[in-house]
Regions:
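A short glycine/serine-rich beta->alpha loop
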Residues: 1, 31-40, 68-77, 131-136
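ATP-binding N-lobe of GHMP and related small-molecule kinases
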Residues: 1-37, 51, 59-61, 239-241, ...
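Short, well-ordered amphipathic alpha-helical segments that serve as non-catalytic structural scaffolds
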Residues: 6-15, 145, 183, 219-220
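Phosphate-handling active-site elements
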Residues: 16-25, 53-69, 96-99, 213-219
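DPxDG-like acidic metal-binding loop motif
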Residues: 39-63, 84-86
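Alpha/beta catalytic cores of group-transfer enzymes, especially the acyltransferase/condensing modules
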Residues: 61-109, 175, 195
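Acyltransferase
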Residues: 109-185, 189
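Glycine-rich, charge-dense phosphate/pyrophosphate-binding loop(s)
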Residues: 152-246
Length: 246
């Protein structure tokens, strides 16, 4: 039943939008993305289903049309837009469309990622957020978000040490991740521009240049290891193409 899983349901949406009959078959799904870690596992399933179905229809949908479907399914474009387009996406969903701007990630920027064996469901991570925040903090977050984007465009990566400072979700969600502040500090000491929570957590991500990425990743993982928390570390680069059929 395609309605019982995200991949099948996403495929069903493409067939309906393309006004073509549903194709039935057996799908084997393998993923390296663990659930409940703030890494966009649901978006991965949605976009994977969309691309698979789009490869089967006679008149494939555009990326813009796929993004509208993905946004409707996910409820926001935050993860599905970059999954479809690659790079950094600044997007907002409207009633029947998504406004999306793609910004190239500087090739010299790498990412040190640590995934601890700590599950944080998206629903629970949302529940710890306050209903209201001080106006001053909201203004500061807008300022930092703007600085973040412009720093990537201008390759002024040292600005990320300030731009990654967040008031909206990190102060609240870090309470769900043991030793979060220690990991952030270890990343900076090892050479990162800054670090933050990936999505709703528990994954933590540091922004760093290529020369220091391995050292930073090891330092982040070492904090969890020292506190007897299993973890995996990754040294990553930004994807610049988006999801592909291979």
């Amino acid at each position: 039943d395609p309605k019982k899983n995200l991949i099948g349901f996403a495929m069903d949406q493409v067939f309906a939008t393309a006004q073509e009959p549903i194709r039935y078959g057996h799908i084997t799904s393998e993923t390296l993305i663990p659930p409940s870690r703030g890494l966009g596992s649901s978006s991965t399933a949605i976009v994977g289903g969309l691309l698979l179905a789009n490869a089967l229809v006679k008149h494939p949908l555009s990326k813009e049309e796929l993004l509208v479907i993905a946004n409707r399914m996910e409820g926001h474009p935050d993860n599905v837009a970059p999954a479809i387009y690659g790079n950094l996406c600044c997007a907002t969903g409207l009633k029947n469309k998504v406004l999306n701007t793609v910004i190239s990630i500087p090739p010299e920027l790498h990412f040190a990622v640590v995934v601890p064996e700590v599950m944080v469901s998206t629903e629970y991570a949302r529940s710890v957020l306050p209903n209201h925040i001080p106006f001053k903090e909201a203004v500061q977050n807008v300022s930092h978000a703007s600085l973040f984007v412009t720093s990537l465009i201008t390759h002024q990566l040292s600005n990320l040490s300030v731009a990654l400072d967040d008031n909206l979700h990190v102060p609240y969600r870090k309470t769900l991740i043991p030793h979060c502040d220690e990991v952030f500090e270890a990343a900076k000491v090892a050479g990162a521009y800054g670090a933050t929570i990936s999505g709703s957590g528990s994954t933590l991500i540091a922004y760093v240049d290529k020369a220091h990425v391995q050292e930073v990743a090891k330092a982040m993982g070492a904090v969890f290891t020292a506190n007897e928390i299993e973890n995996k570390i990754y040294c990553l680069e930004a994807d610049t193409t988006g999801a592909l059929i291979i």
